[in-house]
Amino acid sequence: MLIKALITNLVIVICEVLTLGHIRGKRNILKYYTYLQNFLALIVSLVFSVCSIVYLVSGRIIPEYIRGLRYVATCGLLATMFTFIVFLGAGKKIVITEDDFLFGFSPVMANIILHYICPILSLVSFLLFEREIKISNGIWTAIVAIPSCIYWITYMVLSLTNAWEEPYNFASKANKIWDVLSVLLIPLSFIVISYTLWNVK
């Protein structure tokens, strides 16, 4: 199973490098939740792949924290998929355009890779192929929320103080009250995703 996990994580690395590598303004990686979570997933899958190769060659045990990082990355990717489907998909507020990528790379392909392919691959690998790597320390249920909490707190502070041009318009005064309140579904969904994934791991 570990070989399947290795292959799946290498595919994730290739998909992430291909997509994030074609972003025109690399500083935008710090602006969008999708880019940040996928960049984190890229790093984690790369680390996982290296550790898996070392394990397969030397027989060393893969430490628990490696699967803990995979848990964090998988929850983050699933949260981006949920956010995209609920708030940004179906022609609602898709902000990734051709201007965001180098010539010849389709934003449609970027959306498919970042919001569907990588999250699903990560989920399949975590639940099916990585089970032999035990994870039991409950601290990961707290660590998993750190990247998202940092992003969304920073996002709301910068948006409400008009310190940047808000990428998603979630906090815009032009939005209806319901639209703003509905953003609360994002942390709620993250709690549900992380809780469910932890209990079926």
Cite the ranges covered by each PLM segment:
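Alpha-helical transmembrane segments
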Residues: 1-16, 75, 144-150
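Juxtamembrane "helix-exit" motif on the non-cytosolic side of transmembrane helices
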Residues: 18-27, 87-99, 128-131, 157-165
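Loop-to-helix transition at the N-terminal end of transmembrane alpha-helices
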Residues: 29-43
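Membrane-interface transmembrane-helix boundary segments in multi-pass integral membrane proteins
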Residues: 32, 160-201
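Short, contiguous, well-structured surface segments enriched in hydrophobic/aromatic residues
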Residues: 41-52, 70-91
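Interfacial segments of alpha-helical transmembrane regions
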Residues: 59-78, 134-145
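Membrane-interface loop-to-helix entry segments
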Residues: 108-120, 180
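Alpha-helical transmembrane segments in multipass membrane proteins, preferentially the mid-helix core
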Residues: 117-135
